């Protein structure tokens, strides 16, 4: 090949490499568990496009090992909490959340808030460890990052963005009760037709369901506004040396990338600096490991069922494990069950246990007939992407809400983990597998997920690059952030107009009384004459 053509090919390759513009520097405030999985997908794509990504993680972080090779630069800061302590606390609180008394609203709600406050205290201590580390802060300042990227459910990134005076992009699934979205992002969630997250309601609510929705909304607002947010307000004010609030600081975010989609979420208004990127981690299935593929193929026409309750549920009680195993033994399908514990006594020959499964690849296999899931958003999006109907066994957090959404859309059935029997699970599985309506409904959602002009991952990366190119996206930020609560609701305007009307009525009444008094006086004078 001539030197000329070699040069042309090299230039073309370079043009693709730099197609996103000049490469930028991204500072990431680390998240944990499924929150990190979604962020990592975006960050790896940014690295592929030539950007430099630095992840700021505590020494207690569960998912980060600085000794492992990675395209991401990991900046570890010391903290008093050890990795083991943090993981134990996380597991304890998750277990506590799963066991919350769901039949008593106020008890359930108050205990759930205590769990969230405890996590809030831990994250706040992590944040204090960062901003008080002068050597680290100087190093970060001198690195001259172009953007901060984070999940706001782990606050602190907005404080770093404020201290370094750089733009901020959020990646978020949800916050309990849409607290941060409403009070910090200015999102609109009319309670008349938008169900509060974790309420397990749909957008078609009866009067009493709207009452329940309003109570949920007010309860979340009260608990978070009156207690937890005050701690953050005080901390941020101390660090910045001026009065401020978490809402004000978070409200300066340039872009909110919400890990949701309209085939999952119920319709509601969106602001111009918000984009839905749900399912960004989904991808075509890869070939299965040889042993697993042989087991799947041995299922014949009946196919297989994939079963996973997520990575945060370990050591299932023997009684529950035996109930589930007994149910799975009653169906003709082969079952691949992600399970880490003692082998159930009732385990059937059609079921195999795995400590880990390639979930996305299994869901994308043509022989997969159903997915038994705890209702985590990542798993549900993968099931939608590949068109697999679901049996939901939600445990905590947004999982009951996610399954409620899928049930409303006719793509899933639901069971209660604590009360379901073997017969219940077997019957629900047979219903989902044998009733073609469930497959049709989930395939409709799948077609919608695939029918997008730009893939969710590409949109997410575009907005981060957009913010880096333009040094922010303030032109998309609504002016509502600059208004007080009474200005936002136009209470001052309403008060002024009411005062004007009252003044006019007062003047008219005074004029009428004056005229009446004049005529009355004139009438008396005429009689006396």
UniProtKB/Swiss-Prot annotation:
Recorded hits in InterPro entries, A to Z, give: UDP-glycosyltransferase (IPR050271), UDP_glucos_trans (IPR002213), UDP_glycos_trans_CS (IPR035595)
Q: Where on this protein are sugars attached?
A: 67-68, 88
**Residues of the signal peptide:** 1-21
The protein's location, in the record's own words, is: Microsome membrane; Endoplasmic reticulum membrane
Q: Which EC main class describes this enzyme?
A: transferase
Pull one GO CC term from this UniProt entry.
endoplasmic reticulum membrane
- Keyword field: Bile acid catabolism, Endoplasmic reticulum, Glycoprotein, Glycosyltransferase, Lipid degradation, Lipid metabolism, Membrane, Microsome, Signal, Steroid metabolism, Transferase, Transmembrane, Transmembrane helix
Write down the membrane topology. Single-pass membrane protein
Main subcellular location of this protein, as a coarse class: membrane
The EC number(s) attached to this protein equal 2.4.1.17
Q: Which residues cross the membrane?
A: 494-514
At the top level of its lineage, which domain of life is listed?
Answer: Eukaryota
Keyword Signal attributed: yes
Q: Which GO terms describe its molecular function?
A: glucuronosyltransferase activity
Biological process (GO), any one: bile acid catabolic process
- Catalytic reaction equation(s): glucuronate acceptor + UDP-alpha-D-glucuronate = acceptor beta-D-glucuronoside + UDP + H(+)
Check the record and name the SUPFAM superfamilies matching this protein. Answer: UDP-Glycosyltransferase/glycogen phosphorylase
Q: What does this protein do?
A: UDPGT is of major importance in the conjugation and subsequent elimination of potentially toxic xenobiotics and endogenous compounds. This isozyme is active on C18, C19, and C21 steroids, bile acids, and several xenobiotics including eugenol, 1-naphthol, and p-nitrophenol.
- Spell out the family assignment given in the record's similarity comment: Belongs to the UDP-glycosyltransferase family.
Q: What is this protein called?
A: UDP-glucuronosyltransferase 2B9
Name its species. Macaca fascicularis
The gene designation is UGT2B9
């Amino acid at each position: 090949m001539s030197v000329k053509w070699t040069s042309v090919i090299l230039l073309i390759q370079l043009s693709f490499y730099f197609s996103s513009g000049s490469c930028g520097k991204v500072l990431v405030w680390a998240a944990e568990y499924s929150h990190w999985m979604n962020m990592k997908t975006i960050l790896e794509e940014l690295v592929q496009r030539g950007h430099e990504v630095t992840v700021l993680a505590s020494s207690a972080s569960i998912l980060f090992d600085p000794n492992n090779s990675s395209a991401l630069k990991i900046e570890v800061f010391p903290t008093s909490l050890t990795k083991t302590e943090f993981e134990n606390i996380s597991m304890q609180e998750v277990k506590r959340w799963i066991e919350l008394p769901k039949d008593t609203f106020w008890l359930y709600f108050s205990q759930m808030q205590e769990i969230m406050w405890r996590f809030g205290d831990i994250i706040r201590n992590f944040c204090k460890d960062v901003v008080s580390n002068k050597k680290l802060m100087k190093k970060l300042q001198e690195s001259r990052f172009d953007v901060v990227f984070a999940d706001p459910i782990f606050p602190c990134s907005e404080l770093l963005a404020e201290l370094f005076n750089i733009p901020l992009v959020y990646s978020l699934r949800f916050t309990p009760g849409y607290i941060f979205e409403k009070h910090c992002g200015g999102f609109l969630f009319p309670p008349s037709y938008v169900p509060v997250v974790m309420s397990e309601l749909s957008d078609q609510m009866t009067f009493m369901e709207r009452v329940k929705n309003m109570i949920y909304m007010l309860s979340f607002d009260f608990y978070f506004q009156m207690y937890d947010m005050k701690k953050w307000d005080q901390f941020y004010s101390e660090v910045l040396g001026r009065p401020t609030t978490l809402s004000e600081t978070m409200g300066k975010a340039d872009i909110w990338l919400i890990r949701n989609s309209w085939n999952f979420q119920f319709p509601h208004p969106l602001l111009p600096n918000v984009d839905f990127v749900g399912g960004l981690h989904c991808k075509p299935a890869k070939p299965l490991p040889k042993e697993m593929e042989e087991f799947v193929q041995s299922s014949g026409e009946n196919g297989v069922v994939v079963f996973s309750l997520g990575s945060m549920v370990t050591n299932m009680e023997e009684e529950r494990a035996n109930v589930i195993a007994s149910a799975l033994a009653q169906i003709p399908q082969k079952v691949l069950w992600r399970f880490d514990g003692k082998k159930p006594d009732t385990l059937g020959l059609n079921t195999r246990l795995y400590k880990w499964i390639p979930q996305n690849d299994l869901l994308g296999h043509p022989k997969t007939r159903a997915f038994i899931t705890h209702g985590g958003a990542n798993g549900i999006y993968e099931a939608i992407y590949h068109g697999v109907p679901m049996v939901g066994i939600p445990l905590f957090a947004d999982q009951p809400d996610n399954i409620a959404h899928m049930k409303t859309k006719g793509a899933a059935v639901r069971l209660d983990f604590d009360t379901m029997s073997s017969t219940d699970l077997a019957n629900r599985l047979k219903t989902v597998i044998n009733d073609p309506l469930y497959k049709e409904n989930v395939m409709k959602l799948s077609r919608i997920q695939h029918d997008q002009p730009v893939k969710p991952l590409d949109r997410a990366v575009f907005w981060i690059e957009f913010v880096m190119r333009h040094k922010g996206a303030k032109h998309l930020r609504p002016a509502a952030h600059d208004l007080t609560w009474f200005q936002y609701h136009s209470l001052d305007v309403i008060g002024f107009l009411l005062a004007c009307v009252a003044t006019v009525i007062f003047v008219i009444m005074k004029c009428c009384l004056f005229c009446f008094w004049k005529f009355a006086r004139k009438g008396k004078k005429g009689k006396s004459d």
